[in-house]
Amino acid sequence: MSTDDSPYKQAFSLFDRHGTGRIPKTSIGDLLRACGQNPTLAEITEIESTLPAEVDMEQFLQVLNRPNGFDMPGDPEEFVKGFQVFDKDATGMIGVGELRYVLTSLGEKLSNEEMDELLKGVPVKDGMVNYHDFVQMILAN
């Protein structure tokens, strides 16, 4: 298969809105995610700091194939422990409001739009979410 037909080239072309063979470096995180990677915001910031304002396919492939790869999403138990801090009664449940606060205000922050999209697929019972199930669902996607 030639490079022109690769899924990476196809994804790159979708981000190359002007057909110049270059994309803005600010699109690199979204492009990496479109190619199945899961870079953290810190990784994206580090990568963007090393790139010119616009990135060509060859530069993108160097980023995509970087020697140390990208951080793995993490162990489910680590995420569960993080939510347990907010579970004062040890019920395995967290309020939707608290979940929204945690995910939009702490660590790798989600936007409100991302949070709304995420909550569409989460079973909510009496304003509460089972965070064990939530973690499994997120990591499965």
UniProtKB/Swiss-Prot annotation:
Entry's Gene Ontology BP terms: division septum assembly; mitotic actomyosin contractile ring assembly
Modified residues (Phosphoserine): 2, 6
Protein name per UniProt: Myosin regulatory light chain cdc4
GO molecular function, one term: metal ion binding
Oligomeric form and interacting partners: Binds to myosin II chains myo2 and myo3. Interacts with vps27 and a PI 4-kinase pik1.
A Pfam family: EF-hand_7
Primary residence: cytoplasm
Organism: Schizosaccharomyces pombe (strain 972 / ATCC 24843) (Fission yeast)
Known function: Involved in cytokinesis. Required for the formation and function of the contractile ring.
Annotated residues for binding of Ca(2+): 87, 89, 91, 93, 98
